[in-house]
Regions:
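Extracytoplasmic electron-transfer domains, predominantly the class I c-type cytochrome c fold
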Residues: 51, 58, 72-76, 83-140
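Short cysteine clusters
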Residues: 65-68
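Short extracytoplasmic/periplasmic juxtamembrane "stem" segments immediately C-terminal to an N-terminal membrane anchor
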Residues: 45-62
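Post-cleavage N-terminal segment of exported redox proteins
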Residues: 1-49, 132-144
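Arginine residue identity/basic-tract feature
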Residues: 15, 39, 43, 55, ...
């Protein structure tokens, strides 16, 4: 028994359109999830993750660097983005030397300038933090 609504549609037709449309979009969603899951391992740079990178991430988290800096766009906007700091400062050894010297030289006490606190990190912690920042800079963000 189908009751006709205005415009000639029946309740059964409306139900079928709803179910068909819902199924269509669920399948589209599942396809996109599958595609994304297949592509993520190519972009995460997980193969290059070393123990130094893991320790560097721990230094990053313990000192709340994200409280002032951004990393891949996430975090606070008080201080510079650090995902590509190594590449911006010359890459390879020169980038690492710059980052470590900068960290050791803080605060600069320049009037009117934002100051980074001195964290008194050991050379090992600085090396690990630099490795973490290098690794982060090599993640394929596809230019976002």
């Amino acid at each position: 028994m189908s009751s006709t609504a205005s415009g000639g549609f029946t309740k059964e037709m409306a139900r079928n359109i709803f179910y068909g449309g819902s199924l269509f979009f669920i399948l589209i969603f599942l396809g996109l999830v599958f595609h994304t899951e297949q592509r993520l391992p190519e972009r995460t740079n997980q193969a290059a993750m070393t123990d130094a990178v893991v320790r560097g991430k721990a230094v990053w988290e313990q000192n709340n660097c994200i409280g002032c800096h951004t990393l891949l766009g996430g975090g606070a906007y008080f201080a510079p983005e650090l995902a590509n700091v190594d590449q911006r400062r010359g890459g390879d050894a020169s980038g690492a030397v710059f980052i470590k010297a900068w960290m050791k030289g803080q605060p600069t006490n320049v009037p009117g300038r934002r100051q980074m606190p001195q964290f008194n990190l050991t050379d090992k912690q600085l090396d690990d933090l630099v490795e973490f920042l290098k690794w982060t800079g090599e993640i394929n963000t596809e230019k976002w």
